[in-house]
A protein has these predicted regions:
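Structural signal for the C-terminal ends of transmembrane alpha-helices
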Residues: 21-30, 138-148, 208-213
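Interfacial segments of multi-pass membrane proteins
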Residues: 14-33, 101-128, 186-204
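Hydrophobic, glycine- and aromatic-enriched re-entrant/interface helices and adjoining loop segments
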Residues: 36-130, 151-155
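Transmembrane alpha-helix interface/packing and boundary motifs in multi-pass membrane proteins
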Residues: 1-7, 89-93, 121, 172, ...
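Hydrophobic alpha-helical segments of polytopic membrane proteins
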Residues: 1-51
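Hydrophobic transmembrane alpha-helices and their immediate junctions
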Residues: 126-170
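Alpha-helical transmembrane segments of multi-pass membrane proteins
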Residues: 4, 45-49, 162-172
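A juxtamembrane structural motif centered on a specific transmembrane helix
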Residues: 169-218
């Protein structure tokens, strides 16, 4: 994780956290081990934050600007403010496909990547955004069901690790778009433009399907 962070790639680094937490929790970690892990994690996070060699100034600005983006409306808070305007202006039914003023007017920078949910919400409104979240919920529930019926414990752990990553990515991206989470560069699975993200998601779903298939292998 530290090596990936040094690259620097904050979004990918954060993605490893839910895999670790889900694996330890499902693997039966006890209270004492949990406290040790939390302490070590807090020390590492504090060290990374205070060190000027790992987190870059722009990364720190991204992590803190969501608290009050209005403090820097033309800098680190610009994307969050424009995203909130896009989501709010969509209303219930949206402005229509290709008619979003924030998106088409280029007020929302690069809307097809990390802020694709804001662009979608502006054009399709609350109803469209709710439908997308419902589809994600159904996918995650199906994966959890496959984990419960897996042939062995390793298979269950693999699928639950995938569930943890996808849940984390969805929660952080949507939270980032509506101003509840910091801008970290984490994409929205199956929607954000980006080859590596799409490839990872399809590979993960393929692995989950393989685990499910092996229930029927004697």
């Amino acid at each position: 994780m530290i090596l990936v962070l040094i690259q620097p790639d904050l979004g990918t680094t954060l993605t490893y956290a839910p895999i670790l937490i889900a694996g330890l929790f499902l693997g039966g970690i006890n209270l004492r081990q949990s406290l040790i892990l939390i302490t070590v994690g807090a020390v590492l996070v504090g060290g990374v934050w205070t060190s000027g060699k790992i987190l870059k100034p722009y990364q720190k600005a991204r992590l803190t600007s969501f608290i009050n983006p209005g403090n820097d409306p033309h800098g680190s808070g610009y994307q969050v403010l424009q995203s909130e305007i896009a989501v709010g202006s969509g209303g219930v039914w949206g402005k229509g496909l290709g008619k979003g003023t924030q998106t088409q007017g280029y007020f929302l920078p690069i809307p097809y990547t990390d802020f694709i949910f804001a662009a979608f919400s502006e054009e399709h409104g609350f109803v469209g955004a709710f439908f997308v979240l419902l589809l994600y919920f159904l996918i995650l529930m199906r994966l959890i069901q496959n984990a419960q019926t897996a042939a062995d414990l390793p298979g269950s752990l693999i699928i639950m690790g995938i569930v943890a990553v996808l849940t984390f990515q969805i929660a952080v991206n949507v939270g980032m778009v509506i101003g509840l989470m910091p801008v970290t560069g984490i994409p929205l699975p199956l929607m954000s433009y980006g080859g590596s993200s799409v490839l990872f998601t399809f590979l993960a779903l393929g692995v989950a399907m393989n685990v499910r298939m092996r229930r029927f292998v004697n």
